[in-house]
A protein has these predicted regions:
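Flexible glycine/proline-rich, aromatic-decorated loop/lid segments
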Residues: 1-27, 32-35, 175-191
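Short glycine/serine/threonine-rich phosphate/pyrophosphate-binding segments
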Residues: 7, 102-107, 152-157
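Active-site phosphate/pyrophosphate-binding segments
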Residues: 11-142, 220
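Structural motif
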Residues: 98-99, 146-149, 175
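Glycine-rich, anion-gripping cofactor-binding loops and their flanking helix/strand elements
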Residues: 128-164, 194-208
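Short internal beta-strands
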Residues: 170-174
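Conserved small/polar residues in nucleotide/adenosyl-binding loops
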Residues: 218-225
């Protein structure tokens, strides 16, 4: 993102994201713009290698171009996330779970939360909960469950049921089409539908907002990593 930075000077070739100056420690702009650049590189390579048709390529680019409007749509409901933050800002630990791309986003959500609020948080692959992780869940533990992918949705719902059986309070993050999450989670945050490969760009927004609002309610006034 920064022209002339150390990493740019050390690289043979550079693709700048042009996100502008990043003021916050959390660097949310850099994360979002880097995702977009990766999408564009992947689409270009898939097109050149003949892995997707011209129509699929055009549709994918169109979906990328629609992301800003969908992010704006999520931001219209930011008060809902603020409400959830007001309920859970005093938690001792908060866990994030997800599968596949949702797991990758859960890592970012957990990082942002502990980075700016200093609350202990960890992200785990939902399919590995039984390998010791579930023993950390107790009555009142907040678990943020990401379930946006169609193929793995039911499996993640099963994981939600497992942690709830241990006494967890679950905040589900899913797409508008997955209504079943409302039946198993205590709270649900919905994001607009898009191409499945682009979902991380939308899923991360409510997690970033959650970390931000928890930070306002909980954190000490001076950054520890400044």
């Amino acid at each position: 993102n920064v022209v002339g930075s150390a990493i740019a000077k050390a690289s043979d070739d550079v693709i700048y994201t042009w996100a502008g100056p990043e003021i916050a420690v959390a660097t949310t702009k850099a994360y979002s713009t880097q995702l977009t650049v990766i999408y564009l590189i992947a689409a270009y390579m898939a097109d050149k290698l003949g892995k997707i048709s011209k129509e699929e390529y055009a549709d994918f680019i169109k979906e990328i171009e629609s992301l800003p409007d969908k992010v704006a749509e999520i931001l219209k409901s930011k008060e809902d996330v603020q409400y959830l933050a007001s309920k859970f800002y005093n938690c001792h630990s908060i866990f994030f779970i997800g599968r596949n791309l949702d797991y990758a986003v859960s890592l970012e959500g957990s990082l942002k939360l502990k980075e700016i609020s200093y609350i202990h948080s960890e992200a785990y692959a939902a399919g590995e909960l039984k390998h010791g992780t579930i023993s950390l869940i107790e009555d009142g533990t907040l678990v943020v469950a990401l379930a946006t992918g169609k193929n793995l949705f039911d499996k993640t719902v099963s994981n939600v049921k497992e942690v709830k059986a241990r006494g967890a309070i679950v905040m589900g993050v899913t797409t508008e089409e997955h209504e079943h999450m409302d039946d198993v989670a205590d709270y649900t945050v919905k994001i607009p539908a898009t191409h499945e490969m682009l979902l991380p760009s939308l899923t991360v927004i409510p997690l970033q907002l959650f970390g931000y609002y928890v930070c306002l309610l909980y954190t000490s006034p001076s950054p520890r990593d400044s």
